[in-house]
Every structure is written in C-alpha cells, then in structure tokens.
Amino acid sequence: MTPPRPYSTGLGYESPTEHTVDRTVTSDMAANHLFHRLSELEQTQRRQNAALDNLVSKVEKTDVPKAVGIKDRIACFQWTWFTSTMATGGVANVLASVPFRSQWLYIVGVIFFVFNLCLFFMNTALLLARFRLRPGSFRHSFTDKFESLFIPASLVSIGTILINICQYGVPKAGPWLLTTMEALFWIWTVAAILISAGIYLILWSTLIFPIHTMTPVWVFPAYPLLITAPFAGNLINSSVKAGHTSTLNALPIAMAAVAVQGMGFCLSFMILAAFVYRLMTQKLPRDMQRPGVFISIGPSAFTAAGLVQLGGLAGEILPDDFMMPGMTSHAVFILKLLSAMIGLWLWGLAVWFFLVSVGSFWKYARPEHEAKIGFQMTFFSFVFPNTALLTATYQIANAFSCRPLQIVGCAMTGLLVLVWAVIFVTMIRCIWKRELLWPKEE
C-alpha cells in the first residue's frame, strides 16, 4: 500500500498544481461575472420600476385632473385686467368729445361710463381677492417682468373715470362736484408722479430688460403722467359748461398739468427712441407682443389732445393781470396759436405710430398666413391708445375749424367702438372656454 501524497485531497488540502490553479481562477471569474450580471439586472429592474411609476403618475394626472375651483381662477387675476377699464373709459371719453352732439350719443356715453365704473370695482375686488388667496402675490407682482409694467393701468383707469365724471357729471351737478374734482385732481397728480417714479425705480432695481425684448409696454409706468393735461382740460371745460368758472382755480391746474404732461411725454419719448432702435436691430416684436405696439401712439396723442384743449381755454384760464397788465389778450392769442401748432406736430407723430402699428399686423391679413395669436388682455391696446388719437383729432379739428377732419374722426369713432365690442366679447368667450383665468400647465 502506497502512502498518500503530501497535500493530498484525502487530508483536506492539495498542493497547487497547474490544473487546480486554472480551476480556481476560472471559478473566481465566474463568480465575479455572475455578481456583476446580477447587479446589472437589479439596476435595470430599478430603472424599469421608476419608469413605470412615472408613467402611472402621468396617466393618473391625465385621467383624473385636478379640479379647478372659483378660487383657483380668481388666483389667476392680474393687473393687466385694468386695461379693459382703460379702454372702456377711453371710449366714453371719445363719445363725449364728438363735435356733432345728440341726445342718443350722450346716453351711449353715459352707458359706457357707468359700465366702466362697475367693471373697475369688479376688477379691484377680484385683484384684492387674489392677493388674499395667494399670500405674497402682491409683492411678487411688483417684481414680475410682465405684470409689473401694468400696475399703473389701475391708476390710469382711475384717471379715466375722473375725466368721465368731468364730462358727464359736472355739467349736470352743482358746484360741489366741481370743487370735489379739483381736490381729486391734485391728489391724483401727486399719486401719478409718485407711482410712476416708484414703479420705474423698482423695475430698475430688481429686473433686467434686454433691449431685444423691448416693446412700447415699457412706457406704461409713464402713462398716468400722460393723462394729466387731458384731465385738466376736461375739468376746466366742465366748469365753463356748468357756468362755475369762478369756483375753480384754473391757472394753477393748467400750469401743473402742462408741467406733469411734459414730464410724462419726455420720459416716454426717450423710451420710444429705444423702441425704434430695437426695431432697426431686432425687427418687429414677436406675435404675442405685437398688440403692445399700439401703446406707442399714446404719448404724443394724449399730449396733443391736452395741450390743444388747454390752449383753446386760455381765455378762461388766464386772469386779466397775467404776467403783465394789459397783455392778457395777446397772451391768449399766442397760447392758442402755439398750442395748436405744437399739438398738430405731435398729432402727426401719433398718426405715424398708428400707421406703423397697423402695418405690423398686415401679415395676419394675408390668406397664406395660418398662425393665430392667442387672446390676452393686452389686446385692449388696440383701443385705449387710439382713443387718445381720436380725442387729439377732434381737438385739432376744432382748433383749425376743419370739418373734414371732424367727419374722419366720427368714422373712426364708430370703428373704434366696434373693435372694443369685438375684443370684449372675445374676452368673455375666452373666460367661458377656460382660456383666461385658468391655471397654466406646469
């Protein structure tokens, strides 16, 4: 019997030979390969489970959408909705400025005025409800690149309502309303200056607006300043119609209005210069920004309307001893002529911007153009700046006794009322179809 070899398997171990070493290495490699394979399968299974969970969650969101209540819709309300009151009050202003007067025209103007009052209070209530339902949304609205520019629309709406009160209320009421409107004029003027400067300071301190995104909407914070002269002109004119000129301090009102109007026009003119530069370097704004081009009409149109009206009332504004005794009659003539010529110059600029604004929409009238612009509240820019152009047209026509220009203004007034009606009906339709005041998809 032969003794067992050293390191034999019978003793529980074996000396490493060429064959045993190969088997050991092969076993280790197989184990490692199996381990990596199991890890890969486990990772693949995890990815598949995650993808499946994601798919299920998407299906659940699609099949069972979140219910949107009235509070959710109110939370979507923004400052831009005050453009509707600007436009509606502007239409009432134009109807009061039509030179060919009739009882039915006065009634239609009063209807627009009262409807605008209701619309303004409704917008104010809904906006306050939004701020209450969404804490922090008030502060956020001042730093939003889009919404912050439309905050002054609320103040412009108030100014438009005050102008309508001068046109429709003061001639029918006693001196008490005239005195009240005089006090409100000074309050509103101070508020317009402070809010306009404050909004621009907030924007310049917190936001950056690249020049390639520039639109005339940047002028909007200056708009409260631009209706100061029309406000003063209608206030003084209403005192003349009511026969209470002695009740009103017309000269300080007119002087302050000219100063503030010049402030707003110069500021707007500089901003519009940047807009022309943007047009030369970046072409016209995008489709969704295109309605805002009409805002460029407002600065020169409001200034022309206000200055010409104040100049025409110079005989009622200037006292007998104005600046130099015995020179009042000469001063009245000079101011009437100067205001009419400056107004005509600015009116021409407004007409030019009107032609550019209309021309920017020419491509949408072509049959081969299929793209459509979704409705938004900035569509009221089609109306409000053009109300300024029409009131300026009437003032120019009255200053130069130009009957053909008055007839052209009347024809454009009818067209403007039609445009307002189409936009307002479209707004109601979009609210009903959940295209407005509806949470956007994330």
Label each PLM-derived region with a short phrase.
Residues I236-S238, T245-A250, A257, G264, ...:
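Membrane-interfacial loop- and helix-cap regions that link adjacent transmembrane helices
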Residues M1-K66, E442:
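Intrinsically disordered, low-complexity terminal tails of fungal membrane proteins
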Residues C166-I202:
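A generic, well-ordered mixed alpha/beta core segment in the N-terminal half of proteins
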Residues T124-L126, A340-Y364, S381-E442:
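C-terminal functional regions that serve as terminal interaction/effector modules
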